[in-house]
Amino acid sequence: MARPQSRAQRPATVCQPLGVAGHIRLIACLAVAVAATGACGSPPVASATATPTPPTATATPTTAPTATPDRCAVAQQSPPSGTIPAAFATVLAFAPDGRLFYAQRSGAVRVWQNGAARTFATVPTVTTESNGSYSERGLLGLAISPTFASDRFVYAFYSDANRTQQHVIRWRDCAGTGVAAKVLLTFPSGSDCCHKGGRIAFGHDGMLYVTLGEEHQASAAQNTSDPRGKILRYRPDGTIPPDNPFGPSDPVWAYGFRNPFGIAVAADGQIAVTNNGPSGDAGSPSTGYDTVILSLSRGGGYQWPYCYGYSHPLGGGCNGRRPPDWSSENSTVIPTGAAFIDASGPAAYAGHLVFCTYGRGMLVVTPGSPHATVSAGPSQCRLDVVEGPDRALYVSDAGHIYRFA
C-alpha cells in the first residue's frame, strides 16, 4: 500500500474477501474507511470532511396529451344573407354556432351550413289524409337544445305516416347530419285532419314545452287528464318534471286551447302562445277569433270551448277562465309561428312579440289595456319567424325563407 511521504509509516490494513470472514473484514474495512479515509487505498488528508454528493435527479420527459379532434364540430357560421328557397318551412331555429335549421312540412330537417342548404335528417310523415284531402299533419315543430354547445341535440315534432300518432324526436348533430335518433314522446293522433298543434320550445327553466291541439274534440281542452288542447311541459329527456302544476305524473302546464300553433319565449322567461280560433265548429262563429296569450300562466285555464275571442260565451259562461290578450274577433288571420324580438333587434319590432299569420303576414303586438293591439309587418311572414344572431328577422312562407334587417 502507498505510504504518506511526510508522516510516519502506518500499518497497512489489508482487505481480502475470504469467505464469511472475508466479508466481515470487508465490512470492517468500510467502517475504517468512513472513519479514516487512509484505509484500503488513499491516505487520509488532514482536516478534510467528506461531503456526500446528493444524487442528481434525472428529468423524465413528458409528452402533453394530444387533444382528439371532434369530428362532429362545426366552425362558427355566418347566417344566410339573402333569400333561401325552402318548400313550406314550417319552423326556423338558429343554433349557437350560427347555423339556421329549418323543418319542411314534408318531413325533411334542413340546415344552412357553409353557405348552402343540406339535409340534416328526415322523418316518415304525411301532409294529407288517406284520401288525399286537406290535412294539418306533417313535420310541424323544431327546437335547438339550450345546452347545444355540449350535447348538440336537435328536437322535432311530427305526425307519423300511419296518421295514428305524433312524436317528439331528438337527434345529435354531427357536422350537419343528425345521428342517434331517439323518439322521446308519443301522443295518440285521432282520425281528424286538423288541430294537431305541434310546436315545441325550450323555456328559460330548461324544460321542453309542447303544444297540442284538441283535434276537434273541444271538451278535451278542459280535461287536464287529456293532453289535447294543452301546453305540455317535459324535461329534455321526455320525462315529466315533479313540479308540474297538476302533479308529478301530469305533463299539463296550461289548458283550454283549440289549436295552439305558435309558442315563443321572451328574454325574461315569459312564454307567449298563438291560438287558432273557431272556424266552422258547430255552434261557434264561422270565421275569426284567433287569439294571442302574451304570458302563459302556470296551471292556467284558458277559455276554449266555454268562450271564444274576448270572452264571447259559447252557450253558457266563461266559467272564470282566462281571456286572451288579443283577439282577431270576427276576422280570420290563422296565426302560426311567433317570436319575441330582442331590444337590439330591428327598430320596428324591437322589444315586441311578433307572429306570422297565414292570412295576413306578420303582426306586431303592442301590449295595452284592456287589450293588446297589432300592426302589420312583412307580408312574407306566413309560417314562422325567428331572430337571427345578426339581429335580423328571418321569416318563411310556402316557398322561401327571407331576411329582414
Question: What name fits each language-model region?
Answer:
Residues A67-A87, P248, R321-P324:
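A short helix->beta-strand "capping" segment at the edge of beta-propeller domains
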Residues P80-A87, A121-P124, G132-Y134, L185-S191, ...:
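Surface loop/turn motifs at the tips and blade-to-blade linkers of beta-strand repeat domains
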Residues H167-A201:
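Asp-box/WD-like beta-propeller blade repeats and closely related beta-sheet repeat scaffolds
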Residues S81-G107, V333-A339:
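Beta-strand-rich domains and repeat architectures in extracellular enzymes and scaffolds
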Residues A117-S145:
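Blade-loop segments of beta-propeller domains
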Residues A46-A67:
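Extracellular mucin-like PTS domains
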Residues S106, G132, R137-L139, T147, ...:
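Beta-propeller domain segments
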Residues G41-P43:
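Bacterial signal peptide processing site
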